[in-house]
Design a protein with these regions (language model features):
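DNA replication initiation on ssDNA origins
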Residues: 1-96
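Histidine-centered divalent-metal-coordination microenvironment in nucleic-acid enzymes
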Residues: 100, 123-134
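Short, flexible loop/turn elements at secondary-structure junctions
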Residues: 81-83, 99-106, 130
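Short, charge-rich binding segments
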Residues: 89-91, 117-118, 127-128
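Short amphipathic alpha-helix segments
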Residues: 105-123
């Protein structure tokens, strides 16, 4: 199994835009490991690091059990910026990214296509959440 560090390649900020905080699991860990870029997040999401956990999460039928599993087993980011600690008052630098999270939306592909086709809305990164529901 690969490590998060193997999936998160250092990329110059000027080349790939804003950076934001990356946190190791569990969700109650509020201390960031490092700042990463959208490219790093893409490499993490499309890599194998969380593949096993994602498959397990998607096989859990009970929402409460799935939410508890997700909280314990997934690393996470704060797309809004870099933080000293995950707390609104601890923002170091904002990204100016708008993060939209749509869960349990019927015909999600239609909305994906609309966002991607809209010339007024620049999509930097779009992905399906680990639950497969958003």
């Amino acid at each position: 199994m690969s490590t998060p560090e193997a999936n998160l390649k250092e990329v110059p900020r000027l080349v790939f835009g804003p950076q934001f905080s990356f946190y190791r699991k569990p969700i109650w860990n509020t201390n960031p490991l490092k700042a990463i870029s959208l490219y790093d997040a893409y490499a993490y999401i499309t890599g194998d690091y969380a593949k096993e956990q994602t498959e397990r999460l998607r096989s859990i039928p009970d929402k409460k059990v799935a939410d508890a599993y997700k909280a314990k087993n997934f690393d996470y980011v704060t797309f809004g910026g870099t933080f000293t600690v995950r707390d609104d008052d601890q923002l170091i630098f904002p990204t100016d990214l708008l993060c939209l999270d749509f869960d349990h939306v019927p015909n999600v592909q239609m909305y994906r296509n609309q966002f991607l086709a809209d010339p007024e809305f620049e999509t930097a990164l779009m992905f399906t959440s680990p639950s497969g529901q958003g």
